[in-house]
Amino acid sequence: MILGVHSATFVKNWHEDAKPYIYLCKKAGYKSVEVSLLGQTPSGAKEIAKLANDLNISITCTTGLSNEEDISSSDPVTQQNGVEALKRAIDMTSIMQAKLLTGVVHAAWGISNSMGKDKEDKFKNSSHSIKKITSLLSEKNIKFGDRATQ
């Protein structure tokens, strides 16, 4: 078993540099750190990958979708925005040399504007959108998981 911790345990905002906290996690004995992709840049992702390699600590990645990127939406443009956001997240996960991407990715983060209505349509839209990223996940050898909101 690998015991890890989410870098959000330490940060004050999603865009904060996670590298200092990766050091803290290693020092505390963790073997893995989950890093939010929100606010990450490709150059920052490369630095995180190098640091993780130097410290012999694994990285997993997490992200979320905005209302404008809601893959469960009935609006095709919004769905496509979400697919593109997930593709960027997959690329960033790969840059960090991580093998797992998770988060609230079946829909937009937060409470749905439909307040529980149209769940079957939302499920179909989400599923259809996720199918569009499976080949990229496979190509990059990244596992994908969803954290459903409560």
Language model features: what each stretch is:
Residues 8-10, 36-40, 64-67, 106-108, ...:
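Active-site beta-loop-alpha junctions enriched in small/polar residues
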Residues 44-56, 64:
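Aromatic-lined substrate-binding rim segments of carbohydrate-active enzymes
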Residues 11-16, 35-47, 70-72, 111-113:
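Acidic-and-aromatic substrate-binding clefts and catalytic sites of carbohydrate-active enzymes
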Residues 3-17, 69-83, 115-123:
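Active-site mouth loops of central-metabolism enzymes
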Residues 58-65, 102-104:
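Non-cysteine beta-strand/loop elements that form the S-adenosyl-L-methionine
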Residues 19-41, 89, 95-100:
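Catalytic domains of carbohydrate-active enzymes, especially glycoside hydrolases
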Residues 53-54, 76-150:
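Active-site acidic/histidine proton-transfer and metal-coordination neighborhood
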Residues 12-25, 47, 78-91:
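Short, acidic/polar
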